[in-house]
Amino acid sequence: QYNKDLTKSKSFTFAVVFKDSKISGDEIVFNDEHLSVIFSSFDTSLLLYLYNSFIKKRNVTKRFNKNFAIQLKRLYMVPLKTIEADSVTIKFLSPLLVRQHDRETNKDRYLTFRDPGFDEQLNMCVKNLIEQNNIDYRKEISVKLIPVNAKTALVKNMGLIFNASLGEYTLSGDRQLLNILHKGGLG
């Protein structure tokens, strides 16, 4: 049963990486025909399901329109390195969206690292991720995202525009929590 008041966190994160491409208006112009899709999750069984699903689709052409089709050529699993410190420099492969939902008006606002209340909302998102995915983490949830070489951007998706954070940051917090976020994503 759908409950609009219950925000659901996903147990994975992903990024689509286009090499040598640029955005021109509403189109992505490719100068290289290769792209990478990177998945990560703290749910090993989900990763295995995804991996096996993609194996079945290897060398199958998926056509999106008359000018664009893709074909999965290579698929491999890369072990994630364990974070050994309470602070790590990270670079986002895709924009960070931190959603602040107002239940009374049922409206969303997307915060960037420059907005007041960003740190609190980011920690609320992390808390929801931990709770909704039944992750055994019993310490106080507290992370800090400090901009290093960061910027904000407007991200278009399905006719909507979102405020997002991009670039490099220092992420600090408990080591166990940082490793959970390394696998499952942030935001």
PLM regions: where:
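RNA-interacting cores
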Residues: 1-187
